[in-house]
Amino acid sequence: MCNEYGFDGVDMDWEHPRVDGPSKDQYQELILYLADALHAQGKLLTSAVVSGVSADGNIYYDAAAHSDAVLNAVDWIHVMAYDGGDGERHSSYDFAVNSAAYWCGTRKMPAGKVVLGVPFYGRPGWAGYGDILAADPDAGNKDHAMVSGMDVWYNGISTIEKKAAYARNNLGGIMIWELTQDTDDSGKSLLSAIGRGIQ
């Protein structure tokens, strides 16, 4: 499929069912098989991974599912540094830095193989950034807004720029979840904020 459609490779985002216990070995076997097959064709294999640590510092069980063999087999990892907790803990700047520190420090991943993930949505519930802006036109200038009578926490323009600059200076790159949740207004766009942050 990669060759047929001209893809650069495959990103493995395995979230369910949990990959721990006996299935951890099966997951490792799958990743090693895919890595061999893709690398033989000059293709990439990347993996989305949990942040590694929760907003209150606890290690996520999922992080251990990515064995050293798996981490060595992939070309880079996409650290999902969001959904770290309720309220402002969902995806703060500090949470992103701590997530990167877990993978680079505790797990010894080379920084160039660690890609920082940022959300284009808010919690609790699920509110895309564009929808948040529709509810509060000033939402881009902060990380908290009221949407349908509910407190929603997300990353505004300043936080996204700061995270992008951190990724530029310390990591292998930045990724988003996900593009359709942004706004078409280039002056308030989070994708535009990333562009400014990585310059």
Spell out what each predicted region is:
Residues 114-199:
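Substrate-binding cleft of secreted/luminal carbohydrate-active enzymes
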Residues 6-8, 73, 110, 170-171:
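Short loop/turn motifs at secondary-structure junctions
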Residues 16-138, 144-149:
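Substrate-binding surface in catalytic domains of secreted glycosidases
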Residues 3, 32, 36, 101-105, ...:
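Surface-exposed alpha-helical segments enriched in charged/polar residues
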